[in-house]
Amino acid sequence: MLLDMDLGVLLPSLQSVYVLVFYFVYLAVAGEILPGKVIRGVLLSDGSQLRYRCNGLLALILLVAILGICAKLGIVSPLVVADRGLELLSATFIFCVLVTLALYVTGRSSSNKGSSLKPHVSGNLVHDWWFGIQLNPQFMSIDLKFFFVRAGMMGWLLINLSILAKSVQDGSLSQSMILYQIFCALYILDYFVHEEYMTSTWDIIAERLGFMLVFGDLLWIPFTFSIQGWWLLHNKVELTVPAIVVNCLVFLIGYMVFRGANKQKHIFKKNPKTPIWGKPPVVVGGKLLVSGYWGIARHCNYLGDLMLALSFSLPCGISSPVPYFYPIYLLILLIWRERRDEVRCAEKYKEIWAEYLRLVPWRILPYVY
């Protein structure tokens, strides 16, 4: 009986499918009709530029308001995600597999020569399915890469809110849960306030859309980044005042470094002459920024991201390694990504890169790494 029950919750129910369909339809419609700043993407190799409507913040606020009203009227339960988390996870996984298979088939048959849709086929089915064939595939004029990352970030907040509602109903709401919820909500809201910065990230401008990105956006971000909330739902942790203060400082410093570094990079790409910290930017070879945070470490934004990830886990205390899965995973991922980027940059910039390394010797954490 127990085995049957455990296997049952791993299978997608009709209700979980309905939730997923409603969610995607809402995001598609809201993304098209809600007002928002239209941003030009980076210049692609064929000279084209994609346009992105950055209305994610408005779409998120409206969605939370709609769900709140529906919960108040008894139309939908705020616990639907918390109670059916595994069912939603399995439904999302199946969707990821199906949509990436469709992307593989349509990508292989594409004859488009533009940078966004030109197929890149290696001949290895698994490789092409995993890494993708096209850079910016679309469905009914919707840029799927931008759409999926938006869905993942919003999904993370919705899962957290359902966990919060569950803890209130169970009477298990704690300082730790409140702290975790506040930090994550601020991080996610800030992401959508600065959604246009996403258009200049490596994932958007260089990575093709395959299972790796789709799975990462739709399943990995919302379901694994919320592990701390799930853990706190079943484990009560009482923090001391000094622990709360330290946790807040880690979050604030991490946010300052993360947002500041990404903002400087984004602005530099848009206008290389914009002053940084009140001074003209220092640039190596006319391409590599060595001012501001980017003169402290070559990937200072990674340091901020790691501090933020740590701040999400610190409310859980140190009694278990489980809540620290996210910062540990992120540390491994960012070191791997940083190493990969260094190789690419060395090949691309050659002598300029050697001079850049001399001026900015530290990779992520100054005087340590």
From Swiss-Prot:
Domain of life the protein comes from: Eukaryota
Parts of the chain that traverse the membrane: 15-34, 54-76, 86-105, 146-168, 178-195, 208-230, 240-262, 275-297, 317-336
Membrane topology: Multi-pass membrane protein
InterPro entries assigned: ERG24_DHCR-like, Sterol_reductase_CS
Binding site for NADP(+): K265, K269, L289, W294, N301, Y302, D341, C345, A346, E347, K348, Y349, Y356
Reaction equation(s) it catalyzes: 4,4-dimethyl-5alpha-cholesta-8,24-dien-3beta-ol + NADP(+) = 4,4-dimethyl-5alpha-cholesta-8,14,24-trien-3beta-ol + NADPH + H(+)
CC terms in the record's Gene Ontology section: membrane
Broad enzyme group: oxidoreductase
The UniProt record lists the keyword Transmembrane: yes
Protein EC: 1.3.1.70
Gene Ontology biological process terms, A to Z: sterol biosynthetic process
Annotated keywords: Lipid biosynthesis, Lipid metabolism, Membrane, NADP, Oxidoreductase, Steroid biosynthesis, Steroid metabolism, Sterol biosynthesis, Sterol metabolism, Transmembrane, Transmembrane helix
One GO molecular-function entry: NADP binding
UniProt subcellular location: Membrane
Pathway terms, separated by semicolons: Steroid biosynthesis; zymosterol biosynthesis; zymosterol from lanosterol: step 2/6
Functional description taken from the UniProt entry: Reduces the C14=C15 double bond of 4,4-dimethyl-cholesta-8,14,24-trienol to produce 4,4-dimethyl-cholesta-8,24-dienol. Required for cell division and expansion and is involved in proper organization of the embryo.
Family: Belongs to the ERG4/ERG24 family.
Name of the molecule in the record: Delta(14)-sterol reductase
Originating organism: Arabidopsis thaliana (Mouse-ear cress)
Gene responsible for this protein: FK
